[in-house]
Amino acid sequence: MAKTKKNIGKKILLGIFIAAVAIAVIATVVNFGVYKSLLKKGSEYNKVEIENQLVPEKDENDNWYFTTDGDLKVMHLTDIHIGGGWMSYGKDLKTLNAVATMVTREKPDLVVATGDIAYPVFFQAGTFNNYSGAKIFANLMETLGVYWTVTFGNHDAEAYSYFDREAVAKIYSDEDFKHAMNFVAYAAK
């Protein structure tokens, strides 16, 4: 009888383990689909047409600057909180739309996003993946065609997130992002 109880206990533990693995696999597949869908959505917006758009230049020390005798219009965004997971999908769509609408209407020369672009908080986003939120935001900004830069906030590289600051910095300093004005020390390592 003791052996039977032991076998039942092992079977229960095995069942729990298999269920946990199945849930993890399903969540991974669903979150990847959400990520691809949000990237696609971010690519569907129209490029912002800015009359007499200022074009930044770099000095001999690789510092960005604008030259103008007129106004420099800067838009400041913060706490964008793109979760990039199945639990935040609806909110993320609204966030992309809000950012695109503000940038399109205001037509800034530069957008400065000061932290918390990603929000990989599992119980709200359904993922710990902070890469997704960063990549989705960068993709949106490039689609809009405005110059942009970022700083990190506490949620962009949480201790429990999949990717560290260096990995996220590499996203923002990708050479394919022609409008990104990011000097990121982490990317040089």
Residue ranges and their predicted role:
Residues 3-6, 129, 160:
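Intrinsic low-complexity, intrinsically disordered segments enriched in polar/basic residues
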